[in-house]
């Protein structure tokens, strides 16, 4: 005879292999706080509806509080034979309060129970990630304000394109993180409905109040369809999608840190706090933190892909396949949270080599567009013609082995006789960035204003 809580139908014990593949406590033990919170709300509702006595509900609540304390203190024994967090908690509750524990599962199934637990867990995770992203944004915006006028090369195709400021570059990642926070907020809004009370799949004949349990757990409303309630994992997929995009953004910045810290580039330095050495090469300073952030992106995206594949062919309603929804997601969320904290630390730690940045900003004829713009504004030349003329001047400078601002005026006039000496005033990297005053442009005053705006918004959000 089976000794499982569901074992009344069975006359034999499960095979050992069945036990191994079926058990989930090693993963869903992390849902203990959410499971206990949902059980307390359910017990209170059952009592309010007259389904169980107030005395039983009180004892259940006290017992659950004891279990929460035991788990928090590390004094709780998780038993693999009980399969999951639900049965572990209920079994211990029975040891603490006796038969009244058996009334807790009235009008409830593990199907709606785990769906509720995991929604609460993901909601809590989103809140934690949002707070971490806000701190990341603050770090970037504060550094952007410090370096609103620090000139550096801007790149396209990883080739020097136009001068920008370091602050402007950092603010690009503030904007990305803002969109990431928006995606997480959207996911949170959609997940914030309660499956509790859907029971196995069809609802229950008991006169439960699903609105009461939804409100008690901070949900906006109960889910409207019991089949959907127990079989939906969109909320995990959507959150993993937001996490994947966020991880890609972190990875892009991490990649730049790896490139910029290379001695061949040398635009920034990281301190000993965020670098490691080599076991054989004493001189090495490796940007391992940035590299690991870059690598963790694969874990996050992999979790999204894995769960999409798990869910793609599942008929309604609950299937045991869904037990595989948690481990990858939990690991992905943990990896993302760590990556955000690491990038925040590096953002505060990195030191730009301002002289090297300025010198690099002028390489590769980066102010060529400024010359073309001058031809358009001053000589009223059509831009396409100005583009062609500038290209010929760049070719001439390249042939002579000089920068644009070093090319003699007479040489420029060989290409376009109408060019005057005041053209030299637009060819420095400083004048280039100062001229980019269009909204969203890299002009230092723009950057300082946007950085201050972000810091003000973030401070307001804290309150």
Swiss-Prot record:
Its main location: cytoplasm. Its EC number is 4.3.2.1. The keyword Amino-acid biosynthesis applies. One of its GO terms (biological process) is L-arginine biosynthetic process. One of its GO terms (molecular function) is argininosuccinate lyase activity. Keywords: Amino-acid biosynthesis, Arginine biosynthesis, Cytoplasm, Lyase. One of its GO terms (cellular component) is cytosol. It holds the Pfam family Lyase_1. InterPro entries: Arg_succ_lyase_C (IPR029419), Argininosuccinate_lyase (IPR009049), Fumarase/histidase_N (IPR024083), Fumarate_lyase_CS (IPR020557), Fumarate_lyase_fam (IPR000362), Fumarate_lyase_N (IPR022761), L-Aspartase-like (IPR008948). It catalyses: 2-(N(omega)-L-arginino)succinate = fumarate + L-arginine. Pathway: Amino-acid biosynthesis; L-arginine biosynthesis; L-arginine from L-ornithine and carbamoyl phosphate: step 3/3. It is found in: Cytoplasm. The keyword Lyase applies. NCBIfam families: argH (TIGR00838). Belongs to the lyase 1 family. Argininosuccinate lyase subfamily. This is Argininosuccinate lyase.
